[in-house]
Regions:
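Short beta-loop-alpha junction of Rossmann-like oxidoreductase domains
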Residues: 14-22
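Residue-level signal for the nucleotide or nucleotide-sugar donor/cofactor binding architecture
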Residues: 40-43, 72, 129-132
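Mid/C-terminal beta-alpha module of Rossmann-like enzyme folds, strongest
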Residues: 55-108, 132-146
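Residues that recognize and position ribonucleotide moieties
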Residues: 4, 41, 70, 92, ...
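A conserved pocket-lining segment of Rossmann-fold NAD(P)-dependent short-chain dehydrogenase/reductase
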Residues: 25-43, 47, 51
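Conserved beta-loop-beta element that borders a ligand/cofactor-binding pocket
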Residues: 1-14
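Conserved active-site beta-strand element of glycosyltransferases/polysaccharide synthases
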Residues: 3-5, 32, 65
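Mobile cap/lid helix-loop segments that border enzyme active or cofactor-binding sites
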Residues: 100-126
C-alpha cells in the first residue's frame, strides 16, 4: 500500500472554524489596524478537497505541502474583508511597536502577525488543484459572513 501525508497550512472556507473567520469578523468591526505585513501559507477548503481527490486517483505516496498559489498577507486580508463589508478601517504603522512588543508576550498577537509559509516550490505538482483563486476564495468567505 502507499502512504500519502499531507501537511497543509491553515485551511479556511465558508463557515470554517478557527482564526480565519475571527480575522474576517474583526476586519468588519475594527476602526484601526496595524500595517504589519507578513506572509502566510493558506489553503482554501475546495482546493484541499481537489488535492485529496487527485492524490487518491493518482495513488500518490510521500509527503506533500499543498497551499494556495499566492501567499497571503494579514493586512491585505483585513483590507479585503473591510471593503467587502462596506467598513472603513484605518491601516497605520503607528501601532506596529505594540504588535512587535505584544508578539513576545501574547500568543494570539504572534499568531495573527507572524510570518508562516512554505516555499511555494514545495507545493508545485504535475496536476492543478487550484480550482479557486485566492481572491475568489475570500469573496466566498465574505459572502458566507453576511
Amino acid at each position: 500500500f502507499k502512504v500519502c501525508i499531507l501537511r497543509p497550512p491553515m485551511i479556511y472556507g465558508p463557515n470554517s472554524k478557527g482564526n480565519f473567520p475571527r480575522l474576517a469578523k474583526l476586519a468588519c468591526k475594527t476602526p484601526v489596524f496595524p500595517e504589519w505585513h507578513n506572509k502566510r501559507s493558506m489553503l482554501y477548503i475546495d482546493n484541499l478537497a481537489e488535492f485529496v481527490l487527485q492524490a487518491i486517483e493518482r495513488e500518490l505516496s510521500g509527503i506533500f505541502y499543498p497551499q494556495n498559489c499566492e501567499l497571503a498577507d494579514t493586512v491585505e486580508i483585513i483590507r479585503y474583508f473591510a471593503k467587502a463589508a462596506g467598513h472603513k478601517v484605518w491601516i497605520t504603522k503607528l501601532l506596529n511597536p505594540f504588535v512587535w512588543l505584544g508578539s513576545f508576550v501574547l500568543q494570539p498577537i504572534n499568531k495573527m502577525f507572524a510570518t508562516y509559509y512554505y516555499d511555494p516550490e514545495m507545493s508545485k505538482m504535475e496536476f492543478d488543484y487550484q480550482l479557486v483563486s485566492f481572491e475568489e476564495s475570500l469573496k466566498r468567505v465574505a459572502d458566507s459572513l453576511k
